A protein has these predicted regions:
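Nuclease and nuclease-like effector domains acting on nucleic acids or nucleotide cofactors
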Residues: 1-91, 95-133
């Protein structure tokens, strides 16, 4: 994985060898069939690719085709600007905004690793989709 700043966005981009396992970890087959996870966009959104190669962003919660937005920039080919404060960390809202969490409250923000992030995204999406059903 490579990560760092690209313009005003903090990106975490997965290596091609990681994409399949990361896509499985986020259970995209359940919520976005036919898409693969390419990376994270400023911690709040996944960057996903469809089977035609088009790139989109989608909120981590809720995951669903109705929330896809075409990515408005090309993924950088040049190195990202590293930021040691964030290497290996993903910002997570303890109570996601969708569930009434405050995005500016310091006590609602936690920094987790990639594996924890996958687990949290899956758990909260399961909660969202079960309530929606």
């Amino acid at each position: 994985m490579k990560e760092g700043w690209h313009d005003d966005n903090y990106l975490q981009l997965f290596d091609s060898s990681e994409i399949s396992s990361v896509t499985e970890s986020y259970r995209l087959d359940k919520y976005l069939p036919g898409f693969s996870v390419v990376g994270l966009l400023s911690w709040d959104d996944l960057i996903v690719r469809d089977n035609k190669g088009s790139l989109f962003s989608v909120p981590t919660v809720p995951l669903g085709p109705e929330h896809l937005k075409r990515l408005t920039f090309q993924l950088p080919t040049s190195p990202l600007i590293s930021d040691l404060r964030f290497i290996g960390k993903v910002k997570w809202y303890i109570k996601p905004i969708l569930f009434g969490g405050n995005p500016t409250a310091a006590d609602n923000i936690s920094w987790v690793d990639s594996a924890q992030h996958c687990q949290l995204v899956v758990w909260w999406n399961d909660q969202y989709h079960s309530q929606k059903a």
